[in-house]
């Protein structure tokens, strides 16, 4: 059955909540809220107050994982400090899913490039997921949206390198580009399969 997709030219926190309700699907149990919490120095990410109405309504936990590259999000200590500077933990419960190991491994038996996806261990604590994406261009992924959130976003620090390297993490920045994109699709499919359809997606084109 084809998924229902709703569109709106009005981009406000209230409209996001309205569209979520229109989906007509209840996310049950412990809900993971996957979004991009913002790089250091980036002023265009969608701030906590923009997402607050829908997150408060759902009552979930904002989840992130550490990065595989240098910066302010590649260690748990630095990442938590940045989340605080950006105001996320002032509004919501926040969980760095790969703050402690070992990684959780999702099998991808029909994966084209990768057959395993290494994700944050705490993913096992959640029963459903709300994917809140700031849809925009991305220099490597082409687009930054729901697929990237489900793949790179849910992957652990090691898992990110594994996807970028198309199964060879040591080739994180040198793997064939098409193989990387296919690895993202493989990884995203494993997260969708894990939640058995208990996922809702909201994509917002704002601050492009």
Give each language-model segment a name:
Residues 2-53, 57, 61-208:
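Extended, low-polarity segments enriched in aliphatic/aromatic residues
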């Amino acid at each position: 059955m084809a998924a229902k997709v709703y569109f709106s030219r009005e981009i406000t926190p209230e409209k996001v909540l309205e569209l979520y309700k229109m989906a007509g699907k209840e996310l049950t149990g412990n809900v993971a809220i996957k979004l991009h919490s913002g790089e250091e120095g980036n002023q265009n990410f969608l701030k906590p107050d923009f997402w607050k109405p829908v997150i408060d309504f759902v009552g979930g936990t904002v989840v992130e994982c550490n990065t595989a590259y240098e910066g302010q999000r590649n260690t748990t200590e630095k990442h938590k400090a940045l989340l605080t500077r950006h105001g996320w933990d002032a509004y919501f419960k926040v969980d760095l899913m790969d703050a402690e190991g070992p990684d959780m491994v999702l099998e991808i038996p029909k994966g084209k490039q990768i057959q395993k996806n290494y994700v944050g261990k705490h993913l096992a604590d959640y029963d459903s997921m709300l994917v809140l994406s700031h849809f925009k261009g991305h220099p490597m992924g082409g687009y930054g949206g729901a697929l990237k959130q489900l793949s790179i976003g849910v992957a652990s620090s090691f898992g990110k390198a594994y996807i970028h390297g198309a199964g060879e993490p040591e080739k994180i920045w040198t793997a064939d580009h098409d193989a990387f994109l296919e690895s993202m699709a493989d990884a995203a499919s494993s997260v969708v399969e894990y939640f058995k359809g208990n996922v809702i997606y909201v994509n917002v084109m704002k601050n492009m």
